[in-house]
Swiss-Prot record:
GO terms for cellular component: plasma membrane. This is Putative membrane protein insertion efficiency factor. HAMAP family: UPF0161_YidD. It is found in: Cell membrane. Belongs to the UPF0161 family. It comes from Frankia casuarinae (strain DSM 45818 / CECT 9043 / HFP020203 / CcI3). It is a peripheral membrane protein. It holds the Pfam family YidD. InterPro entries: Membr_insert_effic_factor_YidD. NCBIfam families: membrane protein insertion efficiency factor YidD. Residues 81-152 are annotated as: Disordered. Keywords: Cell membrane, Membrane. Could be involved in insertion of integral membrane proteins into the membrane. Coiled coil: none annotated.
Length: 152
């Protein structure tokens, strides 16, 4: 766990690692987003998108570990992957996950859905789609239209 032994000078107030390598990787991801990713808006299988994941990983864990996390995510982003919500390790779980302390329940009788009281988290139904959006849905359709012409 070498990254935890970094001096305090290498981290900012939010706990993000700063340095030339993380700046370089973040700049490369921003160039990718400005050039290529803008053409393929809304086609990522994961939430957050792979480029947003890479930026968050580099900000949170620095250039080396964040770069490794970003490359591992890119290797997971392939046609056979189911996709879904995949946050950067060490970040907040987001609005789709409700966390409770282990052993705590909503009422003294236990959860109504039959789970045991020791379950640490309850997954809220996701609001995003799995896989790429259909041509008539999503951000890309808003940018380029439905492809059906002005009749529809």
């Amino acid at each position: 766990m070498v990254w935890r032994r970094l001096p305090r000078v290498a981290r900012n107030a939010d706990g993000a690692v700063r340095g030339p390598l993380s700046w370089t990787f973040a700049g490369l991801v921003r160039l990718y987003r400005a050039g290529w990713s803008a053409r393929n808006a809304g086609l990522c299988r994961f939430e957050p998108s792979c480029s947003a994941y890479a930026l968050a990983a580099v900000r949170r864990h620095g250039g080396v570990r964040g770069g490794v996390l970003a490359v591992a995510r890119l290797l997971r982003c392939q046609p056979l992957a189911a996709g879904g919500y995949d946050p950067v390790p060490g970040t907040d779980p987001g609005p789709g996950i409700v966390r409770r302390p282990r052993g705590a329940t909503a009422d003294p009788g236990g959860p109504p859905d039959g789970r045991s009281a020791g379950d640490p988290a309850v997954a809220v139904p996701p609001v995003h789609r799995h896989g790429p959006p259909s041509p008539s849905q999503g951000m890309r359709a808003e940018i380029v239209g439905s492809g059906r012409g002005p009749w529809v």
